[in-house]
C-alpha cells in the first residue's frame, strides 16, 4: 500500500517521496519498480531503520567487546575503600590488644584543665569555644568577633586595660566568652557612655 502510494506520488511530482526509499532503478525507468535486496517481501521499506542501523550495531559491538574484556584483579590494585577499612580494622585490633596488655593509667590534670572543666559544668547548655591564640592580634580578632566594634571613652580606657590585660576572663582562652560579655557591659555602663 505504501509502495503504491509512493509510486503515484512519483508519477505526479517527478521526485521520489521522503517516506519510502526507492531503488535507483525506479529513478531511471518508471516502468520497473524494484525494492532493495534487504527489503523484499514488505510493501513499505523500513526507511527509518536504515539510518539507525550502523550506530546501533556499532554500539552493540562495543558493548559486547567491553564486557568480555575483564581481567582478574591483583591484590596490588585494591580500592581506596578497602584500604580504609583495613586500616580501621588494624587500629581497632591494636586498641583492643593495648587494653588487655596495659591497665588504664591515672592521669592528673593541671589547674587549667580543672578550670576548663568547671566552665563546662557551669555552662552545660552553651557550647564552649576553646581558642588558643598565639599572639594578641588573634585574641583581638576573636573578641571583636564576639562583641562587635566597641568604643571606650578616655575616662574608661584605664578600666578597659585592667579588664583586658589583667583578669583571668580575658587572659585564658576558655573564658573569652565571659570576657566579651564583661567588655560589652563596660562599654554600655554610665561611666563609659558619659563624655
From Swiss-Prot:
GO molecular function terms attached to this record: cytokine activity; receptor signaling protein tyrosine kinase activator activity; receptor tyrosine kinase binding
Pfam families: ALKL1_2
Keyword Signal listed: yes
Subcellular location, record wording: Secreted; Cell membrane
UniProt note on tissues of expression: Highly expressed in the swim bladder and single cells of unknown identity in the head.
Alphabetic keyword roster: Cell membrane, Cytokine, Disulfide bond, Membrane, Secreted, Signal
Phenotype reported upon loss of the gene: Reduced number of iridophores in the eye. Fishes lacking alkal2b do not exhibit any defects in trunk iridophores in adults. Fishes lacking both alkal1 and alkal2b show a complete loss of eye iridophores. Fishes lacking alkal1, alkal2a and alkal2b are embryonic lethal and display total loss of iridophores.
GO cellular component terms listed in the entry, alphabetical order: extracellular space; plasma membrane
GO biological process, one term: positive regulation of ERK5 cascade
Cysteines engaged in disulfide bonds, as pairs: 156-192, 170-179
Family that this chain belongs to: Belongs to the ALKAL family.
PANTHER family: ALK AND LTK LIGAND 2, ALK AND LTK LIGAND 2-RELATED
Subunit structure: Homodimer.
Function comment: Cytokine that acts as a physiological ligand for receptor tyrosine kinases LTK and ALK. Required for neural crest cell differentiation and iridophore development during embryonic iridophore development and adult stripe development by acting as a receptor for LTK. Also required for iridophore formation in the adult eye.
Name of the featured protein: ALK and LTK ligand 2b
Underlying gene: alkal2b
